[in-house]
Amino acid sequence: DVLVHCGDICGEFRYALGESRDYHLRAVGGNCDYEGNLPKELVFLLGDYHRVYLSHGDLLNVRRDNRNLVRMAKQNGCDIAMYGHTHVPEVTEEEGVTVINPGSPVRPRGGSHPSYAVMEIEDGTGKLAILQKELP
């Protein structure tokens, strides 16, 4: 299992991520993460079939559109691009790249509800299922 955090970890939640866990953590720093040394972007494998480009998105102008995010994903050979910054949940397909913003469980914006995303990869086929989850 992999926990992916798209930035703006902020405060003590960052330390909770490091406590005993049964998952791999992949995280980038956001524009509100002033302490620490998280990378601004990260590329990693998800299972045997998917390559992920992860960025908070603030440096790629994702408030305007996903063009730079998709370009960076493609330059890095990725079929999935994940970002945060806007705190608005989104799952789209752009130029062969699955673009995912899980939203925010704490500070949703744009009229969205607190949310996160769950990705499941089917064994043997690599088929990806993405579920947007709203918190109660």
Show where each model-derived region lies:
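Core catalytic region of metal-dependent phosphoesterases/phosphodiesterases
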Residues: 1-46
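Active-site neighborhood of phospho(di)ester-bond hydrolases with catalytic His/Asp-centered motifs
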Residues: 2-8, 26-31, 53-56, 79-85, ...
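Active-site environment of divalent metal-dependent phosphoester hydrolases
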Residues: 10-14, 32-37, 60-64, 81-93, ...
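General small-molecule cofactor/ligand-binding pocket signal
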Residues: 26, 45, 55, 129-131
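Active-site-proximal segments of metal-dependent phosphoesterases and phosphodiesterases across multiple
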Residues: 34-76, 107-110
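Binuclear metal-dependent phosphoesterase catalytic core
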Residues: 40, 71-77, 93, 100-136
